[in-house]
């Protein structure tokens, strides 16, 4: 923007970005004076929620990011997933106009509200599924799911490949066929689910806002 050009050249800002994908895709012109990575963290409400390894949620999937982040891809894949996961339901965020096919496929609009409702919905889900999107520079929704030890299946679009350790905390699919297969695997194979969940529990609270604060101070070279 024209009004920002003079302050930009005057103050020479270094851009602070949220991850590797964000770093790689930031244009040269908007990071002319440099760029650094500062990974964010989920809120303490997610970090402080206790997760029971032995709890087996119903075989449901959840998608808690925006509908413009490849939801159509997801709903099309879910139509195929549903054929092998007959008892499963998919919970997505409103607003969205469900088609008759969506309703038949047990796609359900979540009730949006307090954060505790989101936490409850995530804890009661077997898998978090999201293709990802080129505009996702971090995807806090996926990070919140990971903090609550919900395995993730993604296509890895945008920054989503950064939120998943393939085969350890979820799966990064190479194509839609794999996306469908990996989702069905977690929904129907309790051993796979428990293995992924155990790995996630071991990584729980690996990054919180104390870490973010410390890293920011280092980036800014500030003495506490």
Model feature map: region roles:
Residues 2-35, 47:
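A short, active-site helix/loop in glycosyltransferases that binds the activated sugar's phosphate group
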Residues 52-115:
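Conserved catalytic-core segment of nucleotide-activated headgroup transferases in glycan assembly
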Residues 119, 142-147, 161-162:
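Short alpha-helical segment that forms part of, or immediately flanks, the ligand-binding pocket
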Residues 123-137, 150:
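Acidic donor-binding loop of glycosyltransferase active sites
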Residues 136-139, 146, 156:
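Short glycine/acidic-rich beta->alpha loop that forms part of the nucleotide-sugar donor binding site
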Residues 174, 190-221:
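A charged, aromatic-enriched C-terminal amphipathic alpha-helix characteristic of glycosyltransferases
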